[in-house]
Amino acid sequence: MAQRTRLGDILRPLNSEYGKVAPGWGTTPVMGVFMALFLVFLLIILQLYNKSILIQDVRVGW
């Protein structure tokens, strides 16, 4: 049998939603938007690294 601890009692509410699934699509569209924004961010960083984009007064010297 599992031993009850004070830390376990504190953390129990965080685990109360385990196994429950939101109906429908839930927050999937929000995740998709953030993934797209992250992709744009990575593309901008890559283009700066390749010097495809030159920003005035920003020197890239690596």
UniProtKB/Swiss-Prot annotation:
Pfam families: PsbH (PF00737)
Compartment list: Cellular thylakoid membrane
Keyword Membrane: yes
UniProt-recorded Gene Ontology molecular function terms: phosphate ion binding
Protein family according to the UniProt entry: Belongs to the PsbH family.
Functional description taken from the UniProt entry: One of the components of the core complex of photosystem II (PSII), required for its stability and/or assembly. PSII is a light-driven water:plastoquinone oxidoreductase that uses light energy to abstract electrons from H(2)O, generating O(2) and a proton gradient subsequently used for ATP formation. It consists of a core antenna complex that captures photons, and an electron transfer chain that converts photonic excitation into a charge separation.
Protein name (Swiss-Prot/TrEMBL): Photosystem II reaction center protein H
